[in-house]
């Protein structure tokens, strides 16, 4: 039975939670890695994994579903043009959550969430971007 296996409320109203996860999903699609608290990262997996699965099949209906959930045109374009084809041969497990200690102010457990097959950044490219 699935009694009590609901989602984490994270001390927010349902509309705030929806907006927060929508913003976090757009950030993860755009930057391919984000830093957040561990409970938010674990809950974000439930939002982002089905979106990436939608992105693997670029039909008009899937694009409309993704836009209804994300409300960000650039993120939807990147989802279907880059991220979906990248994970074409992977059946789920598109994200990785790495624990990274505790936040200074309130000791909240922090996590680094990233897409699994994220392209590596060379040291020379990173130096060029920093300058």
From Swiss-Prot:
GO terms for molecular function: structural constituent of ribosome. GO terms for biological process: translation. PANTHER family: LARGE RIBOSOMAL SUBUNIT PROTEIN BL17M (PTHR14413:SF16), RIBOSOMAL PROTEIN L17 (PTHR14413). Gene3D superfamilies: Ribosomal protein L17. Part of the 50S ribosomal subunit. Contacts protein L32. One of its GO terms (cellular component) is cytosolic large ribosomal subunit. This is Large ribosomal subunit protein bL17. Pfam families: Ribosomal_L17. HAMAP family: Ribosomal_bL17. The lineage of its organism: Bacteria, Pseudomonadati, Pseudomonadota, Betaproteobacteria, Burkholderiales. Keywords: Ribonucleoprotein, Ribosomal protein. Belongs to the bacterial ribosomal protein bL17 family. PROSITE patterns: RIBOSOMAL_L17. It comes from the Bacteria.
């Amino acid at each position: 039975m699935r009694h009590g296996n609901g989602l984490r409320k994270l001390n927010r109203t349902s509309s705030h939670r929806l907006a927060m996860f929508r913003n976090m999903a757009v950030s993860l699609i755009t930057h391919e890695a984000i830093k957040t608290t561990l409970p938010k990262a674990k809950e974000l997996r439930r939002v982002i994994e089905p979106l990436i699965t939608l992105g693997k099949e670029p039909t008009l209906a899937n694009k409309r579903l993704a836009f209804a959930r994300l409300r960000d045109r650039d993120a939807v374009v990147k989802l279907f043009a880059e991220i979906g084809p990248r994970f074409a041969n992977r059946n789920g497990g598109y994200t990785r959550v790495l624990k990274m200690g505790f936040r200074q102010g309130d000791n909240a457990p922090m996590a680094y969430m990233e897409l699994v097959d994220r392209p590596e950044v060379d040291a020379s490219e990173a130096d060029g971007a920093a300058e």
